[in-house]
UniProtKB/Swiss-Prot annotation:
CDD domains: NT_ClassII-CCAase. This is CCA tRNA nucleotidyltransferase 1, mitochondrial. Pfam families: PolyA_pol, PolyA_pol_RNAbd. The keyword Mitochondrion applies. GO terms for biological process: mitochondrial tRNA 3'-end processing; rescue of stalled ribosome; tRNA 3'-terminal CCA addition; tRNA processing; tRNA surveillance.
Amino acid sequence: MQSVLYPWHRQVLRCSWSRLCLLKRYLFTMKLQSPEFQSLFTEGLKSLTELFAKENHELRIAGGAVRDLLNGVKPQDVDFATTATPTQMKEMFQSAGIRMINNKGEKHGTITARLHEENFEVTTLRIDVTTDGRHAEVEFTTDWQKDAERRDLTINSMFLGFDGTLFDYFNGYADLKNKKVRFVGHAKQRIQEDYLRILRYFRFYGRIVDRPGDHDHETLEAIAENAKGLAGISGERIWVELKKILTGDHVNHLIHLIYDLGVAPHIGLPANANLEEFNKVSKNVEGFSPKPMTLLASLFKVQDDVTKLDLRLKISKEEKNLGLFIVKNRKDLIKATDSSEPLKPYQDFVIDSREPDATARVCELLKYQGEHGLLKEMQQWSVPPFPVSGHDIRKVGISSGKEIGALLQQLREQWKKSGYRMEKDELLSYIKKT
């Protein structure tokens, strides 16, 4: 990569790729030619760029995809920005016989086109006219810098041309290289435009920063002053961000910060959280890719805390059940563990539950408890099928449904005691003895 910084207004300087550029104040530009960038050029993208160029509309890669490419990562999702209005895009795609899908984003300037079996989400440059802390009324523009100004963080405010030219108006590239997470302009203003940006700040801090603790004082002050604004944000949006915080780096530092700055009560977290347990569990799970709820459950003292979280964030049934399971069993299964067969109580739980996700839940509990050796054994263990059915018991002359059920339970207990080794004939002979 080659780079040049242009700090003065409307100066004409020679760029690093040997052509003259007329650039606005503070615009930083450089040339990117990486394998990750080149890999984006599918047949669909080539057709898209050719169409926009033919109609004299500017088109660039925008936001998070640019950040990822500069970090040497191929982005999973690529968003595009353009000077063309939604009406112009629709006319252009219709004339070219290109199908458009999902028109829900049109009022915000987004058109999704399908080319060569790929979807391309293209959004018109825009400025926020009015904001209420959750949504914005937008106005379309052709000014790239104005669009960059409305974005949340400097590292997310860059654009990339298809010749590899980076357009960076707010030192996003420098912040990315220096592992800094900063709001575009004033933190307070950006946050009040959309209070969810508080959680986005924490999320990207966990992705970008090498060592925790380096925060801008103005940013932390703005977060503390505006934390209550998160009370008006939907639980679903909060949970999306919180899950990403919990699966990122520096999670212990960030959760403590969320409590210190008064954010926690507005996002469904308990006021009397068990932060000591959280400190211990965050170390236990490090390097073992826990599910977000596995770590979050350490903050909860009672199962009712999980229920309250669900009411606020609308978590999935699977996530709620995992939280309830961990809070209920995190101590009991440890107490039940026989030192000679430490995995046995966990295996018995899976056998008794007969639920398809029981093994996965137990594995999350073992991560929580820091039982890494048992976790490896559990992951390698295949749940054995219980060899006796009600039909088998009827064959030995027992027809009462109630009696069959009781016998099946007795046989299951004998089978468990044998380490799941007793076979059908052995178990049925046990009936005859009794």
